C-alpha cells in the first residue's frame, strides 16, 4: 500500500521542523565553538604573525563581532551532520531509490573535496598571497589592518577554493546525465581557460594579479582532472520507483 502524498501544509510543517532543529543545532554549536575561537583565530593569523605584525580594531564592537562570526561559522560546521540529516529526511521521501543511493554516495566526496580545497588554499595560496600583499608596501607604507577586514578577506579567499574543488563532482554528475562528455571537455579546453581566468578574477577578494593567478592555477589542474574523470564515465539515467 502506497503512502498517502503529503499536503502542502504538511510539507511546510516538515520544512519548519527542519529549519528549527537546524537553527538550534547551530546555536548550540556556536556556543561550544566560541570557547575555541582564539585557537582558530591564531591559525588564521599565521601569515600575519609570521611577519611580526599585529592587527587592530577600530570600533568598540569589532573584536567581539569578529569572534562571533568565527564562532557561528564553526558552529555551522559542528552542526553540519544534524543539518544534513534534517535536509536529507526532508528530501529523501521524494527521491527514487537510485537517486537516494547516488546522493548518499556523493555527499562524502563533496565534503572531502570542499575541506581539501580550503586546507590546500590555506597552507599554500593564502599564505603566499597574504604575505606578498602585506609586504608589498615596502619601506614606504606600513600596513594597519583591522581584524574584521582580515577575517573577511580570509573567508572570501578560502571558501571559493572549497567551492571550486567541487569541479570534478560537477563534471561527474553532468557526465553521468550525458550533458557533457570527455570529448566536449577536450574540444572546449581553450574556452575553459578563458572561463577559469574570469572565475579567478571574480572569486579572489582583491584586484591583485598574483591572487588571481594563484586561484587560476588549481582551477586549471582541476579542469584537467575532470577531463580524465569524464573519460571513464558511462552515462546513466536514474531509474526506479519513488518509495
UniProtKB/Swiss-Prot annotation:
Q: Which InterPro entries match?
A: TatC (IPR002033)
Q: Which residues cross the membrane?
A: 18-38, 70-90, 106-126, 132-152, 153-173, 191-211, 213-233
The record's Gene Ontology biological-process terms are: intracellular protein transmembrane transport; protein transport by the Tat complex
GO MF term list:
proton motive force dependent protein transmembrane transporter activity
Q: Which domain of life is it from?
A: Bacteria
The topology of this chain with respect to the membrane is: Multi-pass membrane protein
- Keyword Nucleotidyltransferase assigned to the entry: answer is no
Q: Where in the cell is it found?
A: Cell membrane
Keywords carried by this UniProt record: Cell membrane, Membrane, Protein transport, Translocation, Transmembrane, Transmembrane helix, Transport
| Primary localization class, coarse | membrane
**Is Methyltransferase included in the keywords of this UniProt record?**
no
A GO CC annotation given for this chain? TAT protein transport complex
Give the similarity note.
Belongs to the TatC family.
Q: How does it assemble?
A: Forms a complex with TatA.
Q: What does this protein do?
A: Part of the twin-arginine translocation (Tat) system that transports large folded proteins containing a characteristic twin-arginine motif in their signal peptide across membranes.
- For this entry, the protein name equals Sec-independent protein translocase protein TatC
Q: Which organism is it from?
A: Carboxydothermus hydrogenoformans (strain ATCC BAA-161 / DSM 6008 / Z-2901)
The taxonomy runs: Bacteria, Bacillati, Bacillota, Clostridia, Thermoanaerobacterales
Amino acid at each position: 500500500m502506497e503512502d498517502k502524498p503529503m499536503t502542502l501544509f504538511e510539507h511546510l510543517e516538515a520544512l519548519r521542523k527542519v529549519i528549527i532543529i537546524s537553527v538550534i543545532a547551530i546555536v548550540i554549536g556556536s556556543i561550544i565553538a566560541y570557547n575555541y575561537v582564539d585557537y582558530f583565530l591564531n591559525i588564521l593569523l599565521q601569515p600575519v604573525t609570521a611577519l611580526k605584525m599585529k592587527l587592530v580594531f577600530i570600533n568598540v564592537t569589532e573584536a567581539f563581532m569578529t569572534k562571533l562570526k568565527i564562532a557561528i561559522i564553526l558552529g555551522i560546521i559542528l552542526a553540519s551532520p544534524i543539518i544534513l540529516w534534517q535536509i536529507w529526511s526532508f528530501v529523501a521521501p521524494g527521491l527514487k531509490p537510485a537517486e537516494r543511493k547516488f546522493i548518499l554516495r556523493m555527499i562524502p566526496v563533496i565534503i572531502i573535496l570542499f575541506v581539501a580545497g580550503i586546507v590546500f588554499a590555506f597552507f599554500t595560496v593564502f599564505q603566499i598571497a597574504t604575505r606578498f600583499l602585506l609586504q608589498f608596501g615596502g619601506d614606504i607604507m606600513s600596513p594597519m589592518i583591522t581584524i574584521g577586514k582580515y577575517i573577511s578577506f580570509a573567508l572570501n579567499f578560502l571558501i571559493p577554493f572549497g567551492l571550486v574543488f567541487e569541479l570534478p563532482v560537477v563534471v561527474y554528475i553532468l557526465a553521468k546525465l550525458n550533458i557533457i562528455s570527455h570529448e566536449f571537455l577536450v574540444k572546449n579546453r581553450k574556452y575553459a581557460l578563458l572561463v577559469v581566468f574570469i572565475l579567478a578574477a571574480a572569486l579572489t577578494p582583491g584586484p591583485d594579479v598574483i591572487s588571481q593567478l594563484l586561484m587560476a592555477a588549481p582551477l586549471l589542474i582541476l579542469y584537467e582532472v575532470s577531463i580524465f574523470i569524464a573519460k571513464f564515465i558511462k552515462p546513466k539515467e536514474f531509474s526506479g520507483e519513488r518509495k
